[in-house]
Amino acid sequence: MTKLDAKSIINYIGNAPKKTPVKVFIKGQLDQIDFPEEIENFNETHSGVIFGDWKDVEPFLKENQDKIQDYRIENNARNSAVPMIDMKKFDARIEPGAIIRDQVAIGKNAVIMMGAIINIGAEIGDDTMIDMGVVLGGRAIVGKHCHIGAGSVLAGVIEPASATPVKIDDNVVMGANAVVIEGVHVGEGAVIAAGAVVTHDVEPHTMVAGVPAKVIKKVDDQTESKTGLEDNLRKI
């Protein structure tokens, strides 16, 4: 994936065709209906499913109402500019319920848990675990072999375009429900305690805690023994 800066993301969203995707379960005299190219159809004689943009599907349903006995519509977005990413292309473990938008980079053997939300432009390094309910905002960067604890938030910055994104270096461990404010750089091997709100850069191999987060100590053998990561969880 080509890395996108803020201006590129803004242009991508601004110029993208806005779509309202729908799936319609339909029954009727379907063999008597001509389906336009812009509507995908998987139909038999009297029942089937169609997929398309609502701007195309709505008039189609009205034009063929005399041949359609009944239908049910499923819809999960309105005028959406950014589709969900094709997860099949990643050599990573992505659990059900993760929400990942297009233009996201995910490294080899990364783990994305249930309920994680990853916005456009975010980057996740090899062997990094994004735990349940984590929010990675636009352009947030997480390095290799990290653990971002459940419920944590890495603030996103798409606007203003001049803003600096959150950057988490390699081998960082972040406890549950921690928050890292936009523009903050967390150095390699740092530890962020659960519930911390990080408003300033964190030096490498440093442990911070509190609201706002303050330095507690340098990471030592005792800290590493309590925050060590399990590579078996990252096997595909």
UniProtKB/Swiss-Prot annotation:
Coiled coil: none annotated. It catalyses: (S)-2,3,4,5-tetrahydrodipicolinate + acetyl-CoA + H2O = L-2-acetamido-6-oxoheptanedioate + CoA. One of its GO terms (biological process) is diaminopimelate biosynthetic process. The keyword Repeat applies. It comes from the Bacteria. Gene3D superfamilies: Hexapeptide repeat proteins, Malonyl-CoA ACP transacylase, ACP-binding. This is 2,3,4,5-tetrahydropyridine-2,6-dicarboxylate N-acetyltransferase. The lineage of its organism: Bacteria, Bacillati, Bacillota, Bacilli, Lactobacillales. The gene is dapH.
